């Protein structure tokens, strides 16, 4: 049998066939690329070189190349999984519950307005964990939740501060994709609670901001309502336009129509 690049391509594709790998063939350059579907990382195999080895070693040449490609791709996949972190992300309760029909996301209830999803983060991008990915990772839902909350507590935070009409507003906006996630860090919330003299109000209008406010008067409630609405409208991944009073570990949504109010005591001046 005369071996050609095309025949070698077919032989390698047969031996390296896996549901998680893709093949691309450049007939001009006689190169076969085998890559991971999810990360697009892969190996290029120059077929004329393999054919030349086959002329000398026959079957052994094909086995060696197939083994090399397989081991390299498996090593790449392990490296990615080791580098990946699982982190929680906050989403609106209106966010889809399934990746596709019959494949629900892993979720946890949070507040009346928000829900917790879980992301597999590989630094450059992240993917929300659904049941199929959960099985692929070989983890249970409980393990995912525990790992995610542990990693959330390791996220750093540094607030910017602004005071208006006696009310103090603290803003966290690192743009790491997990600013709203910091709302799940109980020790962070407790440390803020200790420094706040009025009502502690918390808002996550979109993914890339966490607002904590020390509200001491009615004007402060108007400001936080307007502020949250503005951030919600501008956010790349909006979550909720409502803010929450935080007390004893619970979040109570505030239903306020933001408007300028004038308090009167019924007395005329003049």
Curated annotation (Swiss-Prot):
It comes from the Bacteria. Pfam families: DUF1444. InterPro entries: DUF1444. Belongs to the UPF0354 family. This is UPF0354 protein BCE_4835. It comes from Bacillus cereus (strain ATCC 10987 / NRS 248). The lineage of its organism: Bacteria, Bacillati, Bacillota, Bacilli, Bacillales.
């Amino acid at each position: 049998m005369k071996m050609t690049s095309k025949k070698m391509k077919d032989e390698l594709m047969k031996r390296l066939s896996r549901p998680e790998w893709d093949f691309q063939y450049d007939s001009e350059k006689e190169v076969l690329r085998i890559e991971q579907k999810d990360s697009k990382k892969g190996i290029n195999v120059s077929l004329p070189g393999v054919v030349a080895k086959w002329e000398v070693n026959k079957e052994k040449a094909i086995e060696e190349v197939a083994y090399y490609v397989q081991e390299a791709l498996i090593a790449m996949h392990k490296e990615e999984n080791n580098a990946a972190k699982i982190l929680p992300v906050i989403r609106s309760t209106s966010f889809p519950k399934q990746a596709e029909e019959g494949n629900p996301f892993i979720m946890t209830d949070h507040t009346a307005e928000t829900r917790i999803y879980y992301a597999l983060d590989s630094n450059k991008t992240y993917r929300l964990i659904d049941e199929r990915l959960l099985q692929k990772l070989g983890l249970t839902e409980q393990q995912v939740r525990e790992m995610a909350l542990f990693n959330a507590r390791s996220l750093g935070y540094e607030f910017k501060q602004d005071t208006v009409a006696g009310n103090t507003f603290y803003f966290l906006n690192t743009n790491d994709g997990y600013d709203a996630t910091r709302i799940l860090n109980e020790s962070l919330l407790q440390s803020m609670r200790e420094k706040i003299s009025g009502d502690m109000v918390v808002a996550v209008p979109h993914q890339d901001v966490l607002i904590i406010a020390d509200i001491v008067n009615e004007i402060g409630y108007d400001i936080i309502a307007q502020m949250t609405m503005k951030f919600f409208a501008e956010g790349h991944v909006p979550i909720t336009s409502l803010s929450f009073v935080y007390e004893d570990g619970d979040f109570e949504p505030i239903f306020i129509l933001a408007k300028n109010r004038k308090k009167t005591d019924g007395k005329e001046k003049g």
